């Protein structure tokens, strides 16, 4: 009875957040009828009834996307300023990536790694040469890449650095986010992620982000095998470290024989105006994690890049994935990377991001207290009042034709697809400005 009441309360809350036009058009449509396709309200109610309540989506029911735009089931068009957390950097349904997927799906989709396939090696050669690493280990999701990096770091710590077996430590930064598996939440400092899910993975330690003295103290422990860090913290609210931080990380890790692992799942692949966010300081990590835009949003593909000294510490049978390195995912990833190259999307992200931040800085400071970011990974901080907070701003942005999502309470991440043009940036800023001025 209590769970039913909670479900009804959730549905009621969703209804209150929907477009007034949606609510009026569908107020009596609590189930699909023969008169037409499902309404937004029907879709909200069905998900609430049959799906786990582990997400709190913005109430909009989308059915298609193209480039920088998405459309809901009622046909309303929106600017996409989330890009599926950066996964659709190449734009929704990019024709080259779609064509690559179609061409492969009729030939061969999955073999497992029990056999060779004719696409994996092509992908491996391409991505390792592109990023100048000896080897790549293909996986599917971003969190799998993180898990893989942790295993590689521990094995390297034992076989190369000489750490006593099962004593290896990995250091992370406060505010990190790389997924919601038990390993990932074991490094988290966000109670929403970890509270109630212990016991946690041993051998994980955290230090303040953007704090080189704290890192130096931590690395003096001879049992530390690696420091894993986001060049810009995405989920924490697009936290950009001080200039020189990544250079300092590289120097300290080298000095203390500790692996520098760059989590570029969200920041990499042109998002910040460079191929990798670490490229802003011209540093080379020992390991790089890639995902999200590695498939252009069509298919889960992730990767760990490193050199032989690290990668070859793992032998056959010691790590793998049924789907990792499958021919369909590899063909899609090749096309997704080619789009980034051929369309100069890192350069476009750099230019469009500068324009976006310049315009966002003009927003009234009594509502928007801060603007930060690099390339097209940006955020605004909302001054919370009784009548205004980040969630309410996002609801009103939706009503005005732009989709964004709060992160960490008062922060709104603004990360459109990298194919966005200047006139589209300026039109989007007009929507943001109109929305902010309405509070």
From Swiss-Prot:
Residues 1-25 form a transit peptide. InterPro entries: Aminotrans_3, Aminotrans_3_PPA_site, Class-III_PLP-dep_AT, Orn_aminotrans, PyrdxlP-dep_Trfase, PyrdxlP-dep_Trfase_major, PyrdxlP-dep_Trfase_small. Pfam families: Aminotran_3. Its cofactor is pyridoxal 5'-phosphate. One of its GO terms (molecular function) is pyridoxal phosphate binding. Keywords: Acetylation, Aminotransferase, Mitochondrion, Pyridoxal phosphate, Transferase, Transit peptide. It is an enzyme of class 2 (transferase). The modification N6-(pyridoxal phosphate)lysine is found at residue 292. It is found in: Mitochondrion matrix. The modification N6-succinyllysine is found at residues 102, 107, 362, 405. Its EC number is 2.6.1.13. Signal peptide: none annotated. PROSITE patterns: AA_TRANSFER_CLASS_3. Homohexamer. Belongs to the class-III pyridoxal-phosphate-dependent aminotransferase family. This is Ornithine aminotransferase, mitochondrial. It comes from Mus musculus (Mouse).
